[in-house]
Amino acid sequence: MKNLLYLKDEQIKEFIQLLFYAYRETFSDPKEVLSKKFFGPAHLRALNLIEGNPGINLGELIFKLKVTKQSLNRVLRDLIKSKMIKQIKDHNDTRKKNLFLDKEGKIFFETVYNTQKKRIFNALKNSSSDSVIKFKDVLKKIVNGR
């Protein structure tokens, strides 16, 4: 059996630090674009999830972001006021509101995405396809807690 050196504490600590730095750099790339709208990281996280899950309701968004309703309300108010997102009442349950990117939000998100895309694209382009597939698999396992 192989000696699993990558499972030693020092290696795991290094992976955690690298994940932190990768997150920090990727999410700081659009800082200038966000600041023009007076948005911050919380706005970006909400926009990312709404863009990737059109029609997500408030409860699902709270669950995915792992935040309180109170902390999310300010962010959503900002995004609605600036016409980035819109709320549409659910057809089956009118108490629920589904969230979508509005036209302005789609344009803004694309601008933000393009600032982040460069870093990710270059990293993927400079890696083998096998490495990319394995890395994606590891990330999914981290997200799913396996």
Descriptions of predicted regions:
Residues 1-37, 84:
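N-terminal leader segment of winged-helix/HTH proteins
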Residues 1-8, 129-146:
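C-terminal regulatory/oligomerization modules of transcriptional regulators
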Residues 11, 39, 50, 101, ...:
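Residue-level marker of regulatory loop/turn positions in helix-turn-helix DNA-binding domains and
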Residues 27, 77-136:
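Charged, amphipathic alpha-helical coiled-coil/dimerization segments
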Residues 28-68:
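N-terminal helix-turn-helix DNA-binding core of bacterial DNA-binding proteins
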Residues 50-53, 114, 142:
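Short helix-capping/turn signature of helix-turn-helix
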